[in-house]
Amino acid sequence: MGVGGLWGSDLIAQRPEFFQVMKSPFSDEEVVTVKALRPDWAIIHVQEADQYGNARILGSDFQDVLLSRAAQKTIITTEKLVDTEIFQQEPKLTSVPYFLVAAVVVVPEGAKPGICYPTYTMVDATGMKAYGQAIKEGKLDEYLAQVTEGRA
């Protein structure tokens, strides 16, 4: 896929496995292209999912929908499990269809310290700071154990 904004940057030379300069198929100009990412897994947190893996994102989906399509397998974590009938009544609201999903896990407050509109709409600033500090200090495992204790 062609991308703009990379001319003059070192990214093209530093990461040739991702970027390539080629002649545009539409003009005589050169364009920078980027290799499509194909992750093994995507883990996406949603507001609602059914037992089969149909999932709804009730707010901004950011890149989650694209990730579900790019990944070889997707795990959905959800605030709550709902009846499949809800998806059948309004199929256009299905953000991720079941056939892209390998597993569904119910994880209330699974997006914290971030947000999951409309269930919780404020970023937990203290939680974000603690998360950042844990990464900086190499203590992410300890942090995750602390914030997930008693939730399984």
Where is each model-derived feature located?
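Conserved alpha/beta enzyme-core scaffold
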Residues: 1-152
